[in-house]
């Protein structure tokens, strides 16, 4: 009995100690709670930090490491495109479905006083000259203001007047110059019809390109008005979808691609600061490293001719179908886009013993003005278009493309990491560029697409 009573006493003392400890713990918890209690302002700031972290992570996923998602997109937040900060109710297909041509405004959007709409007719030399000069002075340039795209007049006419184009989709905004008593272009946007297959669904849509506003008036927010006006005109043709690219991160790309560059004229590229020599390499070693043989590693390539259109059409059609998102062409479009034109498009074919085209190379010419160099005025860049092999190695095919571009006096060969292009970059000494090109659909939700699954080149 004594042992039991003694045990009870010990339990009682233990319970007292436990109660004391619990009280102290509760006291500490209360103190801790009071110590770390946040004000409403602190909570708001913390939530804002979490939001920024989430947006930064999203930017890396859909854009690039240098991309930043803005807290608000005043224009794009109102458009039928997937948004960064909300779940899209549509997993695939149209977002805005309730559309009818008869509900559209028949008149163009209202512009500020002194500005007016004007369609651009590229068959008229005066209008062609005005558009060329406007784009040459105001279109895309790099962040360091060293290079600016310089699309030639012939290139613009080729690109903007394809088979089936609509003249009213080439839109400018003009403003009267009272001193010179003439009207000048201050804004431009273009649309051309294209056919695209998106994960098995064929769609005819508009490719939006050459959105450009004069530098001095960019604060007037003319770009959204240009986009809305070309959209209105496209809708009048009962077309409700668009595809476009941008180096800027917008809501929301379905594919992020990267440019890679292969030096052809090393000395010039270093002189104009397009590229730099590694610390452990002098000019002589660099020239030797990037030197290309005069002869092609594969014999039999010749410039594409009219007689090759049918074969190239079949080759392109079979090749493009291997990709989840791809364009497709009619025979008339194959002839337009791929038959060689000096300083515009270069295409080569290789045939077998039966004179059937088995392999195909193409690249287009897009020079840039060099803005800060007294010696050089123009950078000649070849841009990879479509390259298809069925009877040779892809690496050998692409090496042929480099040699052919070098023979045409191009300084650099540029290539996106789409299709199977990336498989040869290391072996053929391509270097990664410092920017990304994002692909977007307007009013169409497409699953995220890897570059290798994309066969769509927008110029």
What role is predicted for each listed range?
Residues 167-189, 339, 344-363:
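Conserved beta-hairpin
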Residues 227-243:
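Classical protein tyrosine phosphatase
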Residues 2-14, 22-98, 104, 108, ...:
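Active-site/acyl-donor-binding loops of N-acyltransferases
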Residues 147-158, 244-251, 329-336, 415-423:
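Short amphipathic alpha-helical segments embedded in low-complexity Lys/Glu-rich regions
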Residues 307-321, 340-341, 355-378:
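Membrane-interfacial loop- and helix-cap regions that link adjacent transmembrane helices
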């Amino acid at each position: 009995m004594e042992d039991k009573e003694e045990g009870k006493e010990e339990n009682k003392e233990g319970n007292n100690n436990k109660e004391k400890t619990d009280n102290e713990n509760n006291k500490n918890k209360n103190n801790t709670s009071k110590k770390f209690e946040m004000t409403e302002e602190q909570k708001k700031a913390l939530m804002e930090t979490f939001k920024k972290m989430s947006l930064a992570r999203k930017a890396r996923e859909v854009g690039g490491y240098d991309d930043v998602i803005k807290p608000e997109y005043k224009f794009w937040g109102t458009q039928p495109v997937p948004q960064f900060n909300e779940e899209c109710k549509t997993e695939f297909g149209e977002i805005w479905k309730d559309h009818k041509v008869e509900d559209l405004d028949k008149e163009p959007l209202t512009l500020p006083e002194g500005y007016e709409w004007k369609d651009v007719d590229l068959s008229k030399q005066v209008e062609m000259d005005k558009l060329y000069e406007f784009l040459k002075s105001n279109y895309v340039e790099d962040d360091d203001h060293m290079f600016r795209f310089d699309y030639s007049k012939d290139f613009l006419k080729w690109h903007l007047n394809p088979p089936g184009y609509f003249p009213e989709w080439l839109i400018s905004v003009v403003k009267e110059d009272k001193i010179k008593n003439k009207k000048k272009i201050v804004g431009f946007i273009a649309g051309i019809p294209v056919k695209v297959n998106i994960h098995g669904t064929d769609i005819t849509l508009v490719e939006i390109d050459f959105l450009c506003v004069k530098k001095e008036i960019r604060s007037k927010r003319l770009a959204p008005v240009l986009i809305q006006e070309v959209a209105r005109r496209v809708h009048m043709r009962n077309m409700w979808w668009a595809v476009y690219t941008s180096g800027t991160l917008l809501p929301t790309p379905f594919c992020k691609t990267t440019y890679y560059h292969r030096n052809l004229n090393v000395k010039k590229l270093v002189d104009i600061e397009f590229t730099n020599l590694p610390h452990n390499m002098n000019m002589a070693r660099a020239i030797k490293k990037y030197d290309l043989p005069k002869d092609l590693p594969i014999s039999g390539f010749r410039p594409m001719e009219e007689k090759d259109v049918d074969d190239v059409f079949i080759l392109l059609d079979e090749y493009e179908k291997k990709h989840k998102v791809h364009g497709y062409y009619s025979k008339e479009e194959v002839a337009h886009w791929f038959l060689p034109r000096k300083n515009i498009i270069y295409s080569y074919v290789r045939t077998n013993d039966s004179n059937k085209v088995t392999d195909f190379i193409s690249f287009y010419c897009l020079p840039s003005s060099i803005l800060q160099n007294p010696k050089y005025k123009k950078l000649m860049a070849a841009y990879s278009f479509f390259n298809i092999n069925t009877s040779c190695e892809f690496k050998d095919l692409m090496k042929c493309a480099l040699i052919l571009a070098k023979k045409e006096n191009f300084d650099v060969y540029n290539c996106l990491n789409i299709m199977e292009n990336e498989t040869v970059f290391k072996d053929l000494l391509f270097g990664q560029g410092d920017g990304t090109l994002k692909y977007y659909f307007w009013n169409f939700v497409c699953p995220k697409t890897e570059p290798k699954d994309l066969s769509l080149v927008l110029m």
